[in-house]
Amino acid sequence: MSDILKKICDVKVEEVAAAQKRVSFTDMRRDAESRVLTRDFVGALRAKIDQGQAGVIAEIKKASPSKGVIREDFIPADIAQSYAEGDGKVGAACLSVLTDRQFFQGQPDYLKQARASCPLPVLRKDFMIDPYQIYESRAFGADCVLLIAACLEDGLMAEMEQIARSLDMAVLVEVHDGAELERALRLQTPLVGINNRNLRTFEVSLQTTLDLKKEVPADRLLVAESGILAPVDVHTLRDAGVNAFLVGEAFMRAPDPGRALAQLFA
């Protein structure tokens, strides 16, 4: 685990402990299980791909540890609507909302605001290190959760996936190298995210996705993450057979995020 990732995960341990003092595990589980039906995250991606379009998970992110504040004019509901509409022809399949406070200046309310403003399924983008967070995610309204292989041992990762499935949530499992991919493929989820950013050095290379794609079975849906900034990046990946993408920074820096999405994936 990289230094920054370890630092983030250590903070998460403290955050989960504090959260459980406010709302017990039992109460959070009860809240999660009482929530209304989820939106079909995987189905939304596949529907776009079946139409010949890219399946885009458009991210709502105010800041990051490596770039600082990315978007000053940050209104999650407006951004979500912009993503859903695109240019009227090309729009997002799903949303990803950062809820981490300390490192990404996110918060759970951003997820709630985004989901309430449009019909798209929503991924809670955070660093999951405890089963409590899976129940918490459903209570917040998430339709999908992120499990980062580098943060989790196999047994815990499988347990957290099973909890998510029991709540009818999708799981996006994220990897960066072959060893992590091998572990991720033991899970049942069809969604496999390949992060092109090295969390140790923060260097980004699309070659990471191109290399690892060869090891991803055809029944899994590969999602390319990070470093997708220009049409040439999209063309490179699509030519290699990649059809799903998680993109944030390129849109967050644009005046109209939805139009930027449509232009990137035209």
UniProtKB/Swiss-Prot annotation:
It catalyses: 1-(2-carboxyphenylamino)-1-deoxy-D-ribulose 5-phosphate + H(+) = (1S,2R)-1-C-(indol-3-yl)glycerol 3-phosphate + CO2 + H2O. Signal peptide: none annotated. Its EC number is 4.1.1.48. GO terms for molecular function: indole-3-glycerol-phosphate synthase activity; phosphoribosylanthranilate isomerase activity. GO terms for biological process: L-tryptophan biosynthetic process. Pathway: Amino-acid biosynthesis; L-tryptophan biosynthesis; L-tryptophan from chorismate: step 4/5. Keywords: Amino-acid biosynthesis, Aromatic amino acid biosynthesis, Decarboxylase, Lyase, Tryptophan biosynthesis. CDD domains: IGPS. Belongs to the TrpC family. This is Indole-3-glycerol phosphate synthase. It comes from Acidovorax sp. (strain JS42). The gene is trpC.
